[in-house]
From Swiss-Prot:
ATP binds at residues 262-264, 349-352. Its EC number is 6.1.1.11. This is Serine--tRNA ligase. Catalyzes the attachment of serine to tRNA(Ser). Is also able to aminoacylate tRNA(Sec) with serine, to form the misacylated tRNA L-seryl-tRNA(Sec), which will be further converted into selenocysteinyl-tRNA(Sec). GO terms for cellular component: cytoplasm. It catalyses: tRNA(Ser) + L-serine + ATP = L-seryl-tRNA(Ser) + AMP + diphosphate + H(+); tRNA(Sec) + L-serine + ATP = L-seryl-tRNA(Sec) + AMP + diphosphate + H(+). Coiled coil: none annotated. L-serine binds at residues 231-233, 285, 385. GO terms for molecular function: ATP binding; serine-tRNA ligase activity. Keywords: Aminoacyl-tRNA synthetase, ATP-binding, Cytoplasm, Ligase, Nucleotide-binding, Protein biosynthesis.
Amino acid sequence: MLDSKLLRTATEQVAKGLAKRGYELDVAKIQALEETRKAIQIKTENLQSERNTRSKAIGKAKQAGEDVAPLMQAVESIKQQLVDAEADLARVQTEWDEFVKAIPNIPADEVPEGKSDEDNVEIRRWGMPRSFHFPIKDHVDLGADLGGLDFDTATKITGSRFAVLRGGIARLHRALAQFMLDTHINQHGYEEVNIPFIVNRDSLFGTGQLPKFEEDLFKLTDDREFYLIPTAEVPLTNIYRDAILEDNQLPIKFVAHSPCFRSEAGSYGRDTRGMIRQHQFEKVELVWLVQPEKSDEALEALVAHAEKILHDLELPHRTVVLCGGDIGFSAAKTYDIEVWVPSQNKYREISSCSNVRDFQARRMLARFRNKETGKPELLHTLNGSGLAVGRTLLAVLENYQQEDGSVIIPEVLRPYMGGQEVLAPVKQ
């Protein structure tokens, strides 16, 4: 959530910043609400002053033995006017709050101009896509031949955009998640957290999914307003909602492996085949909480940590910085890491890493105590995938496939697979 004071005092500057992401700030509404608020505030202050003056006059009239009934009536009238004015002020404040909740974050100055993912800017590549001397298969056909990836059964059990993983592929999927966790914990210094997979509205508001993106969420059908998490970012970041951390506790670096649940309401007809876009998938999530002056540096470190997983798996990938028109609602700056998918002959997103600055912290009232001033200040929060496990699985299957339909297991995963080196096709 943006700073209300900034919106009121630097409206044109904010509007210019938001225009980079293609968002048109309703400047007229801000001005109208502010004028109304000020008018009611002035009216309230005048009524309070008049009430105080009349109250003093009543005291003097009583001492003089005069009739105070007219003065009492006037004071009662003023009290009712004050009640009405305070109610009007509350209504204006509610309208303002709802208005501000729907405004996205301001992109960082260095975020490139652009309207869509076509305008994102590649900043580096790692590895060369493999040249195959045989007709390649996609992960759906490979998984079926390996006897471990079954979309038809998942559709029978639940519906479309779900998968059943079995045998070696299920084990490989688990190995990937474990490898990611171990790397981030042992090499990058993250604290592992086992989090709830169900959260309340306050948590989803804190990280920016609510109220704007409710249709993308799976909601439990009872009166408690619980939701399945769309990402572990939600519970991880909310750990310090309504909290004040000491400066020496920072940075906070959390990692969690969890299922994620998304309705994909706006993705009808997109990526309907395979594991690219699922209603349920697993992800290893990275979350940072830092002092404001350290968040830019933290974002670069977070991205490097996610890239390290792909380096170790020897999967070709590239990193792009998202343009203003493609960054998410809460983000000030985002890098996407895209892995090479041979069957599609292109790079596909496998991680999105964002600096949210104080946008979430203001919604959550997540703060730290500045060691210089001793006063609480808003934290900066960051998040990123380290990585999406299902998409990493499909990248391994496709990039490591062999002509006979087998799949070589990446060397770094073999200790998690009991030393197994190859997934072999199931004989029909």
